[in-house]
Amino acid sequence: MQIRDIFILVNTPNLILIPGLGDRKWLYQLVCPLWRARGFCPHVFAFGWEDTANDYHKKQNRLHDYIRNLEGDVYLIGASAGGVAALNALAMDNNDRIKGVATIATPYVYRRRLKNETLARAISELASNLPGMQAKFTHITSFYSIHDQVVPPTDSRLDNHCIKQSNNSKFANINYQQLPTFGHGLTIAAGLTVFGGRISANLTSPPQ
């Protein structure tokens, strides 16, 4: 390996794709070449949503350790439940390693039909973590569809109905973008492929 190749490798930002319920890691590995072409070093991290042997905190700490052991800047894309894990990872990032977070069709409100205790705990933790994330300068964007039978677009928006704030203010560093898609799985697939350029641009743009 030449010095130039080493320089490029070291300076290539890491992108961690975090799947939602089901942890279909192999599906996300299929889109890694697309994100590599956009200038990222892609990783797929299976959170373990269906793993009953470990509790939520062990899973979240495992993600935190994975991020901490990477060299260089880190960007996160969380699909569905994976978006909650991504934002909780940002809350745990005390060294400002994470430079951008995008969530796709992510539920910020827990509904019983989702039927996953790990996700319920993760959303509860997110409610506690979000106010403290206001001071961070990380760019965060929530992408959602026109219609989603699993996670309604309104559940992909953080407001005072789902997260209580004493000053009745909005979360200033979280942006929202609607994708012209229908359906939960299709929105995630389109976000990682067809609209990948749009999401990439949002990830790397400076916070407003």
For each predicted feature, which ranges?
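C-terminal catalytic-base region of ester-bond hydrolases, centering on the histidine
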Residues: 135-208
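Serine-hydrolase catalytic-loop signature spanning alpha/beta hydrolases and amidase-signature enzymes
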Residues: 22-30
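Serine-dependent carboxylesterase/thioesterase catalytic core
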Residues: 15-17, 26, 35-45, 55-143, ...
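Short beta-strand-to-loop junctions in surface cap/lid or active-site-entrance loops
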Residues: 1-13
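Residue-level recognition of beta-strand->loop/alpha-helix junctions
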Residues: 46-48, 178
